[in-house]
Amino acid sequence: MSGFWESCLQRFEQELPAQQFNTWIKPLRLEGESTALEDGLRLIAPNGFILKWVRDRYLTRIEDYSRTFFEGPVTIALVIGSGKATAARIQATTTDSGQNAPANPATTSEKRTAASEKARGKGSNYEKSRLFPSFTFDNLVVGKANDLARAAAVQVANNPGGAYNPLFIYGGAGLGKTHLIHAIGNTIATENPEKIVRYVHAEDYYSDVVRAYQQKSFDSFKRTYRSLDVLLLDDVQFFNGKNRSQEEFFFLFNALIEARKQIIITCDTYPKDINGLDDRLVTRFDWGLTVQIEPPELEMRVAILKKKAEAEGIQLDDEVAFFIAKHLRSNVRELEGALKKVLAYSSFHGRVIALDLAKEALKDVIGSVRNVGMDNIQKTVADYYKIKVAELFSKKRTRAIARPRQVAMWLCREVTSHSFPEIGDAFGGRDHTTVIHAVKTIDSLRIKENELNHDLHVLLQVLKG
């Protein structure tokens, strides 16, 4: 029977993105490999959250594969690992390695000091770059939400001035745009120490323009910026209404591009949607490649929490990571804040980080997160698309009704913890396979259709208040 599970793992590893496979399938184990086949198979999940997720999304595929492998139907039971085993694992983690003990501030400080010393060793150009040495590609968690942006960023870092110039990265606050452009800068500075790389926030650029105007030092200002090999401009939306800054940046942009110097820009919205921005700049931002970073999906949120905890010298238990990730969905900054609160609570009270402690530490934070129900989602979607709520439950299949219905189902899956069957019941008693199809359809279309992706973004913001 171990041959079956090994084959099953290989198949899932080929079919699923690495993060989904590592989060949901890899932690499962087959119990009782010597048990007679007629007694069925028992798959052990490490906790209830993984069990529910696998049961809703993957169990049917496992059952289908078992029928093919064993050439007949096989009963598969999905259960949580015994409490004894779980307790032993937690005890071993806390007593043997100390990884789940309260954070040691000295450890984090030492890591940051080491990173700074390494950065200083890169030369005087790096000293003036204003880059954060701790933001690298190695410690950037990658998922569906940012995989395209990361791929483009790596291309630019490996071939500055040649690929995707300018690179325009947009997305909401706290999604990792700043981390990504610092990672580009750090890679270029490390591999090309002779290049002059500079990170500049849009407000700092504005301040430099004002200072040059007041001191009548525009020649020096222009020389400084035009000497750059790589310009990383963060939060360009702050140029709104700052006409002189926009004019100076327009000429700087032209000069750098003409000299085949690399420009990377971040913003909280798509270039054409930036308020108060000169049309000439909008046009030039479209010369290169524009990529979006979206809010992280559940697997990515879990991976981010574990990575951040690891950086603090903590091995975060799965149940704690899933609990935080399930309730806080907006952005990376929100996750980091919640994790810091849990670590501080653990340190202050001298308690091991476990699910009950996380619930205590975050009761105010999670209590303030708006509780969105499926009925609220249905009403919001119906209002947005100007249809009746009853039409979402109907048998109508016209595009004007079917697409909003699929969007509503996708939102129910994204925003609530309801299973596919529960969502199907809420939409006129539809089968769970209909919901699965709707979710997959929207996931696929949102990558290709900017208008649909915009609709989803707006609806999510409305629902999350």
From Swiss-Prot:
Check the record and name the HAMAP family matching this protein: DnaA_bact (MF_00377)
* Alphabetized Pfam families for the sequence: Bac_DnaA, Bac_DnaA_C, DnaA_N
> Could you describe the subunit structure of this protein?
Oligomerizes as a right-handed, spiral filament on DNA at oriC.
From the UniProt annotation, give the residues forming the signal peptide: none
Please identify the protein, giving its name as recorded: Chromosomal replication initiator protein DnaA
Name a single GO cellular component: cytoplasm
Q: Does the keyword tRNA processing apply?
A: no
Biased-composition ranges, Polar residues, are 93-108
Region (Domain II) residue ranges read 85-129
Q: Which organism is it from?
A: Dechloromonas aromatica (strain RCB)
- Kindly state a single biological-process term from the GO annotations of this entry: DNA replication initiation
Q: Which InterPro entries match?
A: AAA+_ATPase (IPR003593), Chromosome_initiator_DnaA (IPR001957), Chromosome_initiator_DnaA-like (IPR020591), Chromosome_initiator_DnaA_CS (IPR018312), DnaA_C (IPR013159), DnaA_dom (IPR013317), DnaA_N_dom (IPR024633), DnaA_N_sf (IPR038454)
Q: What ranges does the record give for the region Domain IV, binds dsDNA, renumbered to this chain?
A: 347-465
